Regions:
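Active-site-proximal alpha-helix that buttresses catalytic centers in soluble enzyme cores
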Residues: 2-8, 20-204
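Long, proline-/serine-/threonine-rich intrinsically disordered regulatory regions
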Residues: 11-12
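C-terminal motif of bacterial Sec signal peptides marking the signal peptidase cleavage site
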Residues: 15-18
Length: 204
């Protein structure tokens, strides 16, 4: 048991990925399922959507910066059963997220909705998620498996404390099976607006 607990603690450090130390942000966006429209969604990338899942608020912060910079609409990917602080306690081997990590059959997450308004009208989708155990959160994987990205350019972005983007974008591309996927970017919790602007300009 001690070895198992130690292993969970070590992998849990990587899980901190998109998890902020500010607990109050954990479910701040959990009830938002509709796409929020910008005044225009048009840039050099065509009509843009920023779709994201944020466990603690870090991914949401980056998503909003991207949306502001691209004049994009936003869509919050929301689990039907939102994650609580206790659910996200990586150091507790009985917590929801650890149980899901250790049991891949539990990683197909029911979402509140996958019906993105005017989905077919978007040319570019920025797809945001926290890194959990060196890969994309399985919440966003469940979203990707439900959507058809045909004809769209998909640009992943992730948040983590220390882990890089790794193969998370490539793994999502394989799950999707459609769309033109770009390399993507990983941001820390301290990422600035300038960091985000460089990321966006590099994808125009």
């Amino acid at each position: 048991m001690k070895k198992k607990t130690a292993a969970l603690f070590l992998t849990g450090i990587l899980f901190l990925a998109g998890c902020s130390s500010t607990a109050g942000n954990t479910t701040a966006s959990s009830d938002k399922t509709e796409a929020t429209s910008a005044s225009s969604g048009n840039t050099d990338q065509g009509k843009v959507l920023v779709a994201y899942f944020s466990a603690s608020g870090n991914t949401e912060k980056i998503a909003k910066m991207i949306a502001d910079d691209t004049n994009a609409d936003t869509f919050v990917i929301t689990p039907a059963q939102p994650y609580t602080d206790d659910d996200l306690n990586y150091s507790d081997e009985n917590s929801r997220v650890v149980q899901e990590y250790e049991n891949p059959d539990k990683q197909t997450i029911e979402l509140k909705t996958t019906d993105v308004p005017d989905w077919d009208s978007y040319n570019t989708v920025y797809l945001g998620y926290p890194i959990w155990w060196q890969d994309a959160s399985w919440v966003v994987k469940s979203f990707v498996q439900k959507e058809d990205f045909t004809g769209k350019t998909v640009i992943p972005f992730a948040t983590s404390m220390s882990s890089g983007l790794g193969d998370s974008g490539k793994n999502l591309e394989k799950l999707a099976g459609t769309g033109t996927w770009k390399e993507g970017e990983r941001f820390s919790s301290s990422a600035s607006e300038d960091d985000v602007k460089k990321f966006v300009s590099g994808n125009n």
